[in-house]
Amino acid sequence: MSKTTQLSFPAADPFILRAVDGRYYLYCTSEDGSGIPIHVSDDLVHWQRCGTAIGKDTARWGVGCFWAPECYEINDKYYLFYSADWKENPTGALENFRIGVAVADDPAGPFADMADKPIFDPGYPIIDADVYTEDGRYYLYYSRCCYEHNVDGLEESWIYGVELKPDFTGVIGEPVLLLRPEQEWEGRSAAATGRRWNEGSYLLKHNRKYYMTYSGNFFAGPDYAVGYATADTPLGPYTKAPENPILERSAQVTGTGHNCMFRTTAGELMICYHGRTEATGNDRIAFISPAHFDEQGRLVIDAE
């Protein structure tokens, strides 16, 4: 694909898996948060709905806000990591999100929760799971929500990483803070919302460097945008790119963010993210654009 493709249906927080059958599966947040839709395509242009991965009718621990799924093929099984509102809420927290994992034999499901509780409880609400594996070890990246996380008078969302147990039943060690809002562009929503965000991380490796893409600003606002940071190890420390943001609003599309990256069957590097247009209104629509690394090792999005 040499140009940006806009999908024809709402697909917030999109994640695309290229499965062993050669087909592409898209998992996303539904606009009402009641479940995680699955779509399938042979060419990244024409898509068909093929099911719901998990939702309030099938989940064992979540009761709503089924958000930000990512699906991975591991040892002939499909593992879906996602965020949801945890039913265990003794304090009545307004944001009680945690991360869980469901498993299936097929990328189209049916998926079933592996446990009746989240993977772990850090003691604060978390969303936006991303999982990276290397040398037999698994790493979970997530976003601590802004909720009740006051930093110098503003609530902030931070990105953490932690090693996962190989059977996904918990974590190993303590989470490590990786990214927090620091660059000027990450505060464009602060005056209107009282919050600053770093969220929606995705990790990939290129030439022995780890590249973490992430989103900044309010997801429902026009200034939602994507930056990246690099590190020499999966758990950092990470240094943000000075050229951030690398994907932001244009005259046609606003609110561009919460991306994943993948390679096509031809080996092309692609980024999938959501955004809004005048025609789509408040619905978040998925876009797929080519991407590449330049001679200096900078990540470049070709979103024309």
Segment roles from a protein language model:
Residues 1-304:
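Carbohydrate-active catalytic/glycan-binding domains of CAZyme proteins
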